[in-house]
Structure formats: C-alpha cells, structure tokens
Amino acid sequence: MKKFTVLTLFPEMFNNFMTTSIIKKALYEKLIAIKIINIRDYSIGKHYQVDDYQYGGGEGMVLMIEPLVAAIKAQQTRDSVTILLTPQGKQYVQEQVQQFAANDNDLILVCGHYEGFDERILYYIDYELSIGDYILTGGELASMVVIDSVTRLCENVINTQSHLNDSFSKNLLDYPVYTKPVEYGGHYVPEVLLSGHHQKIAQWREYEALKKTWLKRPYLLEKKILTTEQQIFLEKIKNEKSFNDRRKEKNSYEDEFNRRNYKRSTS
C-alpha cells in the first residue's frame, strides 16, 4: 500500500480532496493511505511560531528551519522519500509519476507557504519538485497533484488499460474521444468510430494521437521510438494541407499573443 504524508500549515485544504472521486475510492479500499500533518504542531514557543522575517531584509515571511525539520524527522522512515514542493524544483513529468508509483517508498510531501523555506531545509529532503513554471500560494495544490497522479498508477486503483491510454503514458497525447449525440451543432462523430471495425478504429486512434501530439506537444515525439506504422502516419500528418493550415493558424495566434504581451510589458 502506497502511503503519503503531507506536511502543511493548512490541513483543512485536504478534506474535500480525500473524500472525492478516485482518492476516496483508493482510501476506502485501503489501496493507499494519506496522513496530514500540521507543521504548527512542531512550532516554537507558546505562540506556535513557524515563520519569521528573513535575514538581510526583504518582503515576505520565511518558514523556519526548526519546526520543518522536526516535522520531517518525526515522519521519516527507512523507506520514505521526502519531497519539497517548490517552484525551484525539477519539473514534475509522467516519467517521475511512474517511478514514484513503481517503487515501494512512502512519500513525504512538504508544502511551503509565505516567501518560501529556509534554504537549509535542502539538507533534509530527497527531491525538489515543481508542477510548473508559475507561482501558487502554497504547496498544497502541488501535493494533491502528486498524490492524484501517483495514486492512479497504484495497483487496482483504476483499470490498467485506462491509464495506459492516458496522455503522456506512451509519450503521446490521448486520441480524441466522443459520446452521444452523433451530431451536435453541425459537428459529427467520425464515421470510423461508428463502424464497429476494431482494427480500423485502433489505427484511427493511433493516427489521431500522433496528430494531436505533433500539433500540441511535438517535443514528446523526440523521446519516442516510433514503429514503422507510426513513422508512415507521421509523414502523412506532416503533409496534410488542412493540418498544416491549422498549425500555421496556431503559430500565428501564438505569435500575435506574444507580440501583444511584449508590447504591453514594454509600454
């Protein structure tokens, strides 16, 4: 059973998270365990202090090293991995998700707040992770991302085929999916999906997954060893007039968006 321990100043943020959807199911069936620890329980003095002004001056309060280390050491075991959630960390990607899910280590997730952590915390953790190049109020949402993504890959949580088809699992985005009605607003479900021909459907999905990846995340294909069939599909995709028009339109939109932002930032 995979165990997650979250160190946070705001335990109440996890109430809904733990009682909803896949996480609720995994907890109920004892496929995972989640323990929420309030860092203030390890605070200093009668005022439960966990932060202070930074040396050298500057805006914002800094989380103190003493309560953080005390909280971490109280939860660490020989089999645990301690993860600091910070925008300065390594980008969290699907390969890391798979690694965390595959090994037997329990995960301790340390959530920051305020201006950040006393830098000396780095001596007491194993990983620094970031879920993206943007700033959140604290690490709580990031810790939920880690728990959710790893839980999905834990044994018996969801159907194996479901997560194998997920975007990024094979360095491909997922193929388009449709449900009822067959027609809406003049837009139709592709005929091949209604044909009942399983081989043609599988080929269509492979083709469309490659197409979507090439348009939206082309760098993913650099990591992937393509089959002969996929190589043929990709060449066909690159030569599609309608597809190339869409790509030019997307690039034109992004160029205009960046141009406007640059103009706004320099005016």
UniProtKB/Swiss-Prot annotation:
Q: Which GO terms describe its molecular function?
A: tRNA (guanine(37)-N1)-methyltransferase activity
One Pfam family for this entry, by name? tRNA_m1G_MT
Compartments annotated for it: namely: Cytoplasm
Instruction: State where S-adenosyl-L-methionine binds.
Output: G112, I131, G132, D133, Y134, I135, L136
Q: Which family does it belong to?
A: Belongs to the RNA methyltransferase TrmD family.
State the function annotated in the UniProt record: Specifically methylates guanosine-37 in various tRNAs.
Protein name from the UniProt record: tRNA (guanine-N(1)-)-methyltransferase
Starting at the broadest rank, the lineage of the source organism is:
Bacteria, Bacillati, Mycoplasmatota, Mollicutes, Entomoplasmatales
The record's gene field reads trmD
